[in-house]
């Protein structure tokens, strides 16, 4: 409950910043939570605003770049997805979020075998096994 309140406060602060055309500092973790909030709502436009701002503040954050990957997948910008996957591959092959993004990419392009390979790798690292089993099915 306290974490949800904190997250909502950060989202309010971010929206206030956008509305007032100001710039506030957020940690990379706070921005990641804000991006996740918008992704869960399906508000890709605000998720993209948040990820672009996050990358300006934290340009080397692997987690933020992975969130950018999720947004690009939602926007079906597959050329950019592939480029970012190549950039992140060496540093992210053991993170579930990255592996799930790779699985979605190959699934969306009609390559289910490759998608399943990435899902199987993700099963080794993630707690979301039900999601992954459903994704494979």
Show where each model-derived region lies:
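Conserved structural position within tetratricopeptide repeats
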Residues: 55-56, 86-90, 121-124
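Residue at a conserved register position within TPR or TPR-like alpha-solenoid repeats
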Residues: 37-38, 72, 106
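Structural register within alpha-helical repeat arrays
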Residues: 33-34, 68, 102, 136
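Start-of-helix register in tetratricopeptide repeats
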Residues: 29, 63, 97, 131-132
């Amino acid at each position: 409950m306290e974490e949800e309140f904190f997250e909502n406060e950060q989202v309010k602060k971010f929206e206030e910043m956008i509305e007032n055309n100001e710039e506030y500092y957020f940690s990379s973790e706070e921005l990641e939570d804000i991006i996740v909030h918008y992704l869960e709502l399906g508000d890709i436009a605000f998720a993209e605003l948040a990820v672009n701002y996050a990358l300006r503040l934290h340009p080397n954050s692997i987690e933020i770049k992975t969130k950018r990957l999720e947004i690009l997948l939602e926007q079906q910008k597959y050329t950019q997805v592939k480029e970012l996957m190549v950039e992140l591959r060496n540093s992210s092959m053991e993170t579930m979020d990255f592996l799930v993004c790779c699985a979605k990419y190959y699934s969306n392009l009609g390559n289910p075998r490759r998608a399943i390979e990435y899902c199987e790798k993700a099963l080794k690292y993630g707690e979301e096994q039900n999601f992954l089993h459903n994704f494979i099915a």
